[in-house]
């Protein structure tokens, strides 16, 4: 498994205009802008974190561009605001190149979650392009 390249499929919190102070507007995931990549993930600052290398992100950008996939990059919300826990760090502990990828979700973990159908389709295209590369 060492040096394998992996996409950790997960969702990303979408910008919520009702709670704008939780996220930085310029680094948040938005509906209708495509598949989301989170280069850095973790909770409580640096606990259980993963940071994808610039080289790996560059390769993924080329794969997505070649596959005509719409994508966006995003960051987590404020430190200690909650959320951000993923399994990417576990895969990275085995020496894999890994980045979180998926769709933006509003109301994550609530009874009624919302996503963009267009983003879901772009994520599908992104995973197909990645597996074909």
Regions of interest found by a model, annotated:
Residues 1-2:
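Conserved small/polar residues in nucleotide/adenosyl-binding loops
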Residues 13:
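Short, glycine/acidic-enriched loop or turn micro-motifs at the edges of active sites
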Residues 16-19, 23-112:
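Active-site-adjacent substrate-binding region
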Residues 103-133:
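His/Asp/Glu-rich mid-to-C-terminal helical/loop segments that flank catalytic regions of hydrolases
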């Amino acid at each position: 498994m060492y040096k394998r390249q992996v996409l950790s499929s997960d969702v990303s919190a979408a910008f919520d205009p009702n709670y704008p102070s939780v996220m930085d507007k310029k680094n948040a995931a938005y509906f209708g802008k495509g598949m989301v990549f989170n280069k850095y993930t973790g909770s409580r600052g640096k606990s259980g974190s993963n940071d994808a290398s610039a080289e790996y992100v560059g390769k993924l950008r080329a794969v997505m561009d070649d596959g005509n996939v719409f994508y966006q990059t995003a960051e987590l919300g404020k430190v200690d605001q909650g959320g951000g826990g993923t399994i990417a760090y576990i895969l990275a502990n085995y020496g894999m190149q890994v980045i979180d990828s998926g769709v933006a979700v509003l109301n994550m973990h609530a009874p009624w979650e919302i996503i963009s159908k267009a983003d879901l389709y772009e994520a599908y295209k992104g995973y197909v392009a990645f597996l074909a590369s």
